Amino acid sequence: VKVLIAEDNEDTRFYYDLLLQKHRHILISAKDGEECLRIYHDELENIRLRTDATQKIQPFDAVVLDYKIPGRDGLEVAKEILAVNPHQRIIFASAYVRDILMEAVRHLKQLVELVQKPFNERQFIEMLEDTEVYRELSKFGMDINDIKQAQFRHEQLNNLLKVLRELRKRPK
């Protein structure tokens, strides 16, 4: 999993780095909103130069944003990223009260995920790795190794799961 994280607290950035390295994920971190956007736009441009325009390749599997970061805050960063790439997976990781954060991100008009700080390591990694989605797909008899090899994006996995749920509801 390749993750871009915008976090102003140096100790927290270090924690993310250790955590993601431990689970063999790739982390690129930014200390503020401007740096995050610069990294995101650079990576998006590099991908566009290397791939066919019809392919929907994401520069990052997830972008994790602290709600309050210097310069442009997490909400502004999310708005700009989603404006250029509406399929990008965004996760807000914040110590803010969940209700306040949910109200703020509602204005994005896009599905974003929230994780409350402090979070436990397993919860965060499972969220990044779509562990719960894979568990549910396996209940439908799907071969999880085949699905992982196909390297579906988070959005595609959720769409597959949604279709399977709807098919299960239909009368035979």
Predicted segments, located by residue:
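Two-component/phosphorelay signaling modules centered on CheY-like receiver
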Residues: 10-35, 41
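Acidic, metal-coordinating helix/loop segments flanking the phosphotransfer/catalytic sites
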Residues: 29-62
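Acidic catalytic/metal-coordinating carboxylates
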Residues: 32, 73-76
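Active-site residues of response regulator receiver
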Residues: 66
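The feature encodes the CheY-like receiver
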Residues: 70
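Alpha4 helix (beta4-alpha4-beta5 surface) of REC/receiver domains from two-component response regulators
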Residues: 76, 96-114, 122-126
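CheY-like receiver
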Residues: 134-172
